[in-house]
Structure formats: C-alpha cells, structure tokens
Amino acid sequence: MEILLNKGEGRSYWVLGDLYTFKATGKQTNGTLTVMHQVIKSQGGPPPHVHHREDEVFYIEEGRFAFLLGKDQKIFETGSFIYIPKGTMHTFKNIEDKPGRLLVTITPAGLEEFFYAIGTPAVDLHNPPPFDPAIIGKVVQLAKEHNMEVMIPEDQT
C-alpha cells in the first residue's frame, strides 16, 4: 500500500511539548518502519533513553541540535544525518532560539504506540497543551513496556 501525504498531513500528537506528525506507521508498513516529522521547541527534546528494539535515523530539516550519543555530545545542523543503533543511550536538544525540524525513521515499527500513549492528539498545531509533571512517571513506566529505558534525574520523578 502506498502512503501519499502532502505537507502538514499525518496524525499529529503533542509529546512532551513537541509536535510529532506520523507520516508512516507500522500498520501502514506491515511493521517495517515508522516515519515521523518532529517540530522541536527551543531547548526541547526527549530525556536520555535507550531503545532495546529499534534503530533510529534522524535527518535535520532545520535547526541546530546537540545530540548525546553514549558519552559523546556532538552538534548537528540543517542537512545532517544521524543513525543511532538500538542499545545506544541517546538524547537530543534543540539549541536554537526557534523551533527545529527533524524527519525521524524508526525500524522496526511499533514505537508510535508509545508516543500515542504519552502524547495528546494535536487539535491546535501551534499551541501545545500545558505541561503536566505527572507525565514523567507515565513516560518511565510505558517506556519499559516498549523495550526502552528512560533516564530521568531523581529530582524530576
């Protein structure tokens, strides 16, 4: 089955204050891959984490991001490509003063279910819902159910 989407199309969710739009999901790709477009707010990004099942590929469409890969931090900007194999602790942060844009491919598919569970369907694509600190515990618990570990400092749990 082909997937044909125009700019802005796809299923969008607010995830920890950032906008994730799913372009291809496991249901559409027979479990092969998930593709999502992410708009990451200034200083936004996920907590450090490890995927035990999935590899991730990031293409920076716009912006500058600091990626922590294991113990190494590197800065990447528009046009950069980053492949992160499963088992690698990583995180990233938008270090610009404006939103940045990423195209992310995850293989195999399935991790979108985690994002659906921790996110909020995006009715308004410009204004995220207020941050609820209770989400942190939910993120840690649901990550375990999706073969991930999330490293949250104790003062934030």
How would you name each of these model-derived features?
Residues 1-33, 125-157:
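A short, N-terminal "cap"/entry segment at the start of jelly-roll beta-barrel domains
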Residues 113-126:
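A hydrophobic, small-residue-rich beta->alpha segment in the mid-to-C-terminal subdomain
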